[in-house]
Amino acid sequence: MKVNLGCGSKILQGWVNLDKYDVYPVDVVHDLETFPYPFETGSCTEILMNHVLEHLGADADIFNGVVKELHRICANDARLYINVP
């Protein structure tokens, strides 16, 4: 499964588009600072976080939780794309 985390208005065809807000036609509404994420362990083959990570983790526990969840949902050969400014 390919997942576009924190997609906002950038809806991608063929991907599961997740955002915190139900403003755009996303597939899943979920706060990325709330654990666990709504995906099975090892179920994601590609994860995209485009200008999202810098908005997460007001403290170290939350940031570490985000990283742990990304690791948990990634398949063994997953690709993780993180773009930050």
Question: What kind of feature is each model-predicted range?
Answer:
Residues 3-9:
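Class I SAM-dependent methyltransferase "Motif I" SAM/SAH-binding loop
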Residues 9-40:
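Adenosine-cofactor binding site in Rossmann-like domains, unifying the SAM/SAH pocket
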Residues 44-45:
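Local beta-strand N-terminus motif with an aromatic residue
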Residues 63-79:
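A short glycine-rich, Lys/Arg-flanked "PGG" loop and its adjoining helix->strand segment in the class I
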Residues 48:
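A conserved beta-strand element that flanks and buttresses the S-adenosyl-L-methionine
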Residues 57-61:
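Short N-terminal helix/helix-N-cap motif within the alpha/beta-hydrolase-1
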Residues 5, 83-85:
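Short strand-turn motif at the edge of the Rossmann-like AdoMet-binding core
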Residues 51-55:
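Short catalytic micro-motifs in class I SAM-dependent methyltransferases
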